[in-house]
Amino acid sequence: MRSNLVLAAGFSLLLVGAARAADVAEVPRADAMFAPVPMTSDEWIVTVRGTVSIAPKFEGSDRFGLFAFPGLGFRRASQPVQFSAPDDGADFAVYRQNGFSIGPVARFRPGRYLNDDARLFGLHDVRWSVEPGVFVEYWATPGVRARAELRHGVRGREGFVADFGVDWVSRLGAFTAAVGPRLRLADAAYQRDYYGVSFAESALSGRFAPYRPGGGINSIGAAASLGYQWNQAWGTTVFAGYRRLMSDAADSPIVRGIGSPNQFEVGASVSYSFRTGL
């Protein structure tokens, strides 16, 4: 446990240190995202997004599946376009000033079912979940963004999960590239839902030992994306991510027996934006 706490502290210092280092380095002229935005327009920009990805069939799985899901975002027409990483939750900034943004966020989380993998026989299903919460974001420079999300499941899984990340963002014409580290923390309820095994499940499955994980570090990893804005309406993005399960999640007999602590994901999305008066 002490080594995990040291690892978490070191990782957090890395994120903070990276943002501070970029803050003192020479950077290009600050772009529009740092300017106060007048909220006078009654028009909104609505962005509809479709995403497909290849990812583990469930958290901790060593088998991959194809996933497709929609996305929806909106902002005032007077607000500048801001970078959003593919692994960001859907959010709306209620406050945005001097590089800081804060507001509600939500994310869809797939479940885990027996038809995902017959080797799960004897274990409980994990129902898909919607996780509402709050996000905080800070642009230290036009090219460095730090973001945190705290969410809580309201269907199926009811635990808390917190995601932290820093992105180095580079814009060249219509291209936007980004890469950065990720850290996820989860409470005991979240961990037990996906990685726990009760005594009854252990006896029924005949495969998994009883296991009751606690909260703490769920994973560390990295994410990268490359986007291209074809015009004011259409954009495309390709992305990849890696998470390494840690601590109690990695020690789960589910992960050790039929899964893997190495979680990879690749995908692509298409977005369409239009103006409307709401």
Task: Walk through the language-model features, giving the residues of each.
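Cleavable N-terminal export/targeting peptides
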Residues: 1-41, 61, 259, 276-278
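Outer-membrane beta-barrel transmembrane domain signature
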Residues: 22-23, 78, 91, 153-163, ...
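Outer-envelope beta-barrel architecture signal
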Residues: 40-48, 64-68, 79-81, 96-102, ...
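Transmembrane beta-barrel strands of outer-membrane/channel proteins
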Residues: 46-54, 87, 104-110, 134, ...
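Flexible, solvent-exposed coil segments and beta strand-coil junctions
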Residues: 47-53, 112-116, 127, 140-147, ...
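Membrane-embedded beta-strands of outer-membrane beta-barrel proteins
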Residues: 48, 70-72, 90, 132-134, ...
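Transmembrane beta-strand segments that form the barrel wall of outer-membrane beta-barrel proteins
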Residues: 48-56, 80-89, 117-121, 144-154, ...
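Solvent-exposed loop/turn segments connecting transmembrane beta-strands
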Residues: 57-64, 125-128, 151-161, 216
